[in-house]
């Protein structure tokens, strides 16, 4: 029993202990929670205190900023007030000087009048005594008294006139002061209102930002034309007062009616202006009052009568021309200015003599002509190293038979003297170790055929022409030697031009070559820049200024860069390695002038390399002009399709091609990328739309798209974002797209070389490819090229294609058809003497065809739209027709009467010539009567003719679109018509380049007609200036290159 009690008590004891522990632990937890909550409360209070302190600090900072801004505003106001006081003081001084000058001028005029009266009295007295010596003295004394009275009367008139002029000047100055005070008060109120609004907003920084534009605006307005409310009405009052004073014999205030020039173009008041702004009263004094004082000082003393007054005004007007010449484009002067035309006569002397043909040549100067030719004899070029190739022993030991067999194995053909032997491995090329490591990393195991032969030739410093099939590694064949060549020369510093220059015909090819070079140049520390149109020129210019060893470019944009800033951006003096990729297109007639001009600006001892997959003979003749003893390399045949490409040509009409394309897409869409070629931009977009409707996502690429769209399209196509691309021939050259399995020529290529490059987009770098070409019976003229391509690449020729080509060649032999061109010798004007002569000859032939007889004495400027009298040509034709009719009547009458005529001219002397014949037969009488009738009709026409006016024409059809839009817009034509008084209308029809103008049609031109010859000349000169500005803007600002036909909205 006792043990059970003990056990129970111990159990209770343990339970109590556990309860105590639980209470203590719960108390401990409560204390800890209480401490944690109190600490959180303290932290919260600390954060609130910090936030309050930050707010106080920000508030104090804002108050300091506000005080600082107010202090700055007060200081600015003090400076403004000080400036106003200084201006008022200067104005008072100028007013005093002006009054003193006027008084001196009036006193001098008075003295001269007195001297003139004294001389007149002396002459009259001398004349009186000479003829009437015997007259009594009484009348002579009376005459002297009358003369004294006249002198006193003249002096009173002069004094009255002087007082009126002084009063008018004082009133004018008072009016100006009142307006200036009103303007200053208005400006001060505006500034206070703005400052009050900014203070209410409580943003100090914005107040500082708003004060600066307001101050700049006030300064800008001060330099502009100053007009206040009521200015025009007061000016009209001044004009009436000036007219009244002119009627009274003075010319003091008559010039006040001229409006204030823009910006104060006079030099008299330039020293009195502050550097930051132009005071309106200063501008008025400099442009109005001081010139009037100069006029009064330069005027002759006696200008009492109207005739002398008029001549003096003319002298003053002519004297104003001696200032600095004004150029076209200034603010159009007011209608009341009599010297509007006279101010620019000297400026336009040259432009009037310049005919429209010379103007077109000057304005439409090509890019190649804008790049000046360098005289290499005056430049001291530094020598450089060309030959880096050392033949290894394994290659040296090869016998001639072994070399020939190896070349045959590589399908190589070489032409030239001492051609190096082809290499077998990369190590034998003579490249640096860094280049060899990069080649190994990129996975190039051994050189391809063109590389095996081109590398030793180019590394030896020889010029070469490389002709290899598409996808054969031509880019690497010239990039690797160029990198070795550049690395051997001194480093490029900012301001130097590139050492290596690569030119390509398309922008996409430039981007691709640039990306290939970047793979190697980064390891060597060489900078490479891509220069091409359609993209921002600012970044390209900045990269060139930093220095670039290699430049990859299109010729047009490169010439733009070379011409910009007079050649200060970059130059070609250091170019020692020149490459032209796709050289056959580079030397086509469209590119040849630009290429030639760039080549002429590089040093003569450079190394030049040309590569292409096709190279016709006629283009090779042009290309060899820039080469020195070149070596020609051919891989396979010349202009031959790669044998790894399976070619299929199908004769299909236009309406069956789309369904056949869908069938091909269903078969090849999942195998790889597909490229479809069409012949035009419209066809490209329409086919894109049709494929989208049939569920095929695709991309389009053509020259009408923006450059950014073209780059993103190619990037998406190469990166498998989309595997179907529809393109024009802009994608036919040089583009390397991995896994491109099928090429479809939806429209047949228009020449053989284009076909080779199109199908060469597949089957690259040893891969197999497939190409399908559609041709219809209407396109039979292109069938022989397709047969040639298939035969040269050892492909089977379909029977229907062979029959199509045979039928066309039979028609050619019969003369009913003409074989199409080679696709070379493109368009593009050269603007040289030959084209000028051809144009003139064609124009003369057309004139003869329509029965017009040109005047031998007329110059081209008269023919090409010079100013002429309206109706002058019609009157001349009427007179010529009348004379011809009279001659025919006289000749017929004379032949009927069996009379001999000795002259063919029957002009105004025709009646006298006919009347001199003594035989009064009936035929002679009829001829005489006909001549008289014609002359009477001409006299009647001239009597009822319209008033004489002048007209001219200015052709604008061939100018860029922005220039045509600007020159035909009313915002441009309106001020010119108002200024010159000539009417300008747009006539004719716009004809794109290459479109033939019809017989009864005219190209787009401006027709100018006016009441005077001078007005028409001035209007035409101003129109030419606007066109020239637009043309220069298009050529000299390559960043604004013309966009294509399409744009993405």
UniProtKB/Swiss-Prot annotation:
Domain-level remarks: The Q motif is unique to and characteristic of the DEAD box family of RNA helicases and controls ATP binding and hydrolysis.
Organism listed in the record: Oryza sativa subsp. japonica (Rice)
Acidic residues: bias regions: 229-239, 335-358, 855-864
Recorded catalytic activity of this chain's protein: ATP + H2O = ADP + phosphate + H(+)
Basic and acidic residues composition-biased segments: 64-106, 161-170, 181-199, 304-313
Domain Helicase ATP-binding: 455-633
Residue ranges with Basic residues bias: 118-131
Protein name per its UniProtKB record: DEAD-box ATP-dependent RNA helicase 42
Highest taxon above the source species: Eukaryota
Pfam annotation, one family: KH_12
Domain Helicase C-terminal: 644-805
Keyword Repeat on entry: no
Molecular function GO terms recorded: ATP binding; ATP hydrolysis activity; RNA binding; RNA helicase activity
EC numbers for this chain: 3.6.4.13
Residues noted as binding ATP in the record, renumbered to the chain: 468-475
GO biological process terms, semicolon-separated: mRNA splicing, via spliceosome
One Gene Ontology cellular component annotation held by this UniProt entry: nucleus
Keyword rRNA processing applies: no
Coiled coil ranges: 1012-1037
Disulfide bonds: none
Biased composition (Low complexity): 201-214, 262-272
Family to which the UniProt record says this protein belongs: Belongs to the DEAD box helicase family. DDX46/PRP5 subfamily.
Motif Q motif: chain residues: 424-452
Region Disordered: start-end pairs: 1-279, 299-358, 816-868
Key words of the record: ATP-binding, Coiled coil, Helicase, Hydrolase, Nucleotide-binding, RNA-binding
Motif DEAD box: positions: 581-584
